[in-house]
Every structure is written in structure tokens, then in C-alpha cells.
Amino acid sequence: MGNELQHRTVLLDEAVDALVTRPDGVYVDGTFGRGGHSRAVLARLSDAGRLIAFDKDPRAIETASGIEDARFEIVHDSFAAMKGALDARGVGRVSGVLLDLGVSSPQVDDPERGFSFRANGPLDMRMDPTRGESAAEWLARASVQELTEVIRDYGEERFAFQIAKAIVARRAESDRLGPLDSTGELAQIVGHVVKTREKGKDPATRTFQAIRIHVNQELADLQVVLEAALSLLEQGGRLVVISFHSLEDRIVKRFLQTHASAPAVDRRLPIRAVDLPSPPLKLLGRMFPSDAEVAANPRARSAVMRIAERVAP
């Protein structure tokens, strides 16, 4: 219950205002979390409306099971499975797709989930602890090269190679020290390597982000769900995406810009602009949390919401 109360949905009203254009439409919440956005969407829908939500986290599924509403359905799966799940339900087109990326406060604040370096816990980091390889399992087998690439590319950490070497060196001591399987020890290893300090940021922040993204295939799944959302949106349907770090936002921005731009054509070819296919999306801008929201919920500070509408059939 405590974690439920601590979670504050970011850009709640702004996201739902941007998403819901038809009260009788079919909508998708790709990241149910603790249900803030889903409940707000349901409040905007008529009796004919429908909301299908996705989440990998069993605790999110447990929370969603408490919503007794015939218009609502929860799917225990990654949003990357959206297209197949909707096809199986006979849903070919939707009026809107909402994606609220990253981890939720209850996940971060629960030491047992292994997402945070602030309290010691098992080194897990899986959105769904019942599926896939944990962070500890991956760290126990990854090479220096693989560790370096993940920490550098997903954490934008300039000390990635040194951190990777330190992790592998610690692994060599497993017979004497036991496995590297706690968030506290990983944070300590990183802290010994990263001597510089970014204002307001723990030295382990980038490494933990990188490992979490890798373990959960977050960026690959994001690319898949963006393509799925584009194929599912009806004309006039909205795609609303809330990102919390530059890697996510870069992918979202590039995808939206690509599909909102006319195809490039060699000017020397005898082709008129009117003969070219219209881009499927129209960009409706981006939004940031207000100063008041950030003051009430500091974790909202890095959020950016991008909105696009399908304009082509």
C-alpha cells in the first residue's frame, strides 16, 4: 500500500487530454504501472469505449485486477507484444496509444526489485521477475567487451571500460567472496571507479540505468512498439509518449520525425510533390511537466511528452 501511495503519475491530465479524441474509441495504455493514466482514460470514455493495457510487472497486473470495469482489459506482457495481442482480440485499429516509459516509483523504491543503488537488495532489475535473465545472472557471464558496450551505449558512461574491468575482476573473486548479486556491492564497485561527481547524481546512476535497459530490452522493445502503434492508429488517432532520458527520447523523436516527413526525392527526377505519398503522422508538439508538478514530484523533472496524430488513412 505504501508504494501505491508514493507513486505519482507524471503529466497525467496533459497525457489524457492529448490521447482521448473519441469517447467511444479503443485505446491502449502500453505501460499500466499503477494505473494512474488508465483510470483517467476510463473516466473520459463512454460506455462504448474500450481500454486495453499492458504491463510486464506482476504487481502491476495485481493492481489492474482490482479495476472492475467491462471496458477495461489488462494484458500481462511487454508492450512490444501489442500488435499480436490486439490481433488476437480482433482489434485492427485503435484511437490512441499511450506509452509512459521507464520504471515506476514503486519499482525503484522496492529494494527487492534491484533497480536502485540507494538501498541494498538483490541484483535483479527485471520488470517481470518471473521471466528472463536477471542483472546478476548477466553480470556473471558477460565479457568485458559486452559490459563496456552496454554501459557506454545505454548509460552514456565515459568510464564504461574501467567499470567493466572492475566487474570482471570482482567476478574472478567469486570463489572467495561469493557471487556479485547485490545492488549495494555493484554501486560500491562503480563508486570506486567513477571518481568524478555529477551534481545531484550518484556515480552509479548511469551504470544502473544501462544494465536495466539491457536486461529488459527496453530500447529494442520501444522501437517495436512504435512501429506497432503506427500500424494500429486509425486516421485521427493519437500517439502519446512520455520519456525520461535522452536515449528513449532520441528514438521517439527520430521515429516521429521520420514518419511525419515527406519522402526525400532527387530534384532532378520528374516527380511533383503532389504525386508523393503523404506522411502518415503529423507532429503535435511536445510538453514538459510544470514547475508545480516538478516541485511536488522531483522525479518528473526529466520527463518529456511527445504527441503525434495519424493523418493518413
Curated annotation (Swiss-Prot):
Per its record, the protein catalyses: cytidine(1402) in 16S rRNA + S-adenosyl-L-methionine = N(4)-methylcytidine(1402) in 16S rRNA + S-adenosyl-L-homocysteine + H(+)
Recall the GO molecular function terms of this protein's record.
rRNA (cytosine-N4-)-methyltransferase activity
Q: Which UniProt keywords apply?
A: Cytoplasm, Methyltransferase, rRNA processing, S-adenosyl-L-methionine, Transferase
Residue sites binding S-adenosyl-L-methionine per the record? G35, G36, H37, D55, F79, D100, Q107
GO cellular-component terms in the record? Answer: cytoplasm
Which principal EC class is assigned to this enzyme? transferase
GO biological process annotations for this chain's record?
rRNA base methylation
Keyword Cytoplasm among record annotations: yes
Q: Where in the cell is it found?
A: Cytoplasm
Q: Which InterPro entries match?
A: RsmH, SAM-dep_MeTrfase_MraW_recog, SAM-dependent_MTases_sf
Q: What is its EC number?
A: 2.1.1.199
Q: What is its main location?
A: cytoplasm
Q: Give a yes or no for keyword Cytoplasm in this entry.
A: yes
Q: What does this protein do?
A: Specifically methylates the N4 position of cytidine in position 1402 (C1402) of 16S rRNA.
The entry sums up its family as follows: Belongs to the methyltransferase superfamily. RsmH family.
Protein name, as recorded: Ribosomal RNA small subunit methyltransferase H
Organism, per UniProt?
A: Burkholderia thailandensis (strain ATCC 700388 / DSM 13276 / CCUG 48851 / CIP 106301 / E264)
Which lineage ranks, top first, belong to the organism behind this chain?
Bacteria, Pseudomonadati, Pseudomonadota, Betaproteobacteria, Burkholderiales
